[in-house]
Amino acid sequence: MNEPTVENGKLVRRNESGTLTQVALIYSPGYGGGFSSWDTKYPGCIYCPELALGILNGGTNLHEIVERLFPGLYADWESGLRVEWVELGKPYYLHEYDGSEWIVTDFPIA
């Protein structure tokens, strides 16, 4: 798998032959206010490439990134953000319970 790149406003990965295969999704597994699910002002924050790269690179500047890109964000993101790589074109669901989020990709489609 090649290094992630930003394409069409999302952080993505390509396989060795150059085919686009995965997209990065950001979520907050801690309880409180779900990062990608609670604030309706920033519905696309789940795909933010700059924040996803910050998380993948150790998270040392996440506070600055979130404050700059999402001022006034209503979410409990400081308890920890995670990136999950999802296969391109695969349906997913961002599940949330009491602010704790997780990505579900294995579910029946009727």
For each feature predicted by the language model, list its residue ranges.
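Catalytic phosphate/metal-binding cores of nucleic-acid and nucleotide-processing enzymes, i.e., regions
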Residues: 2-110
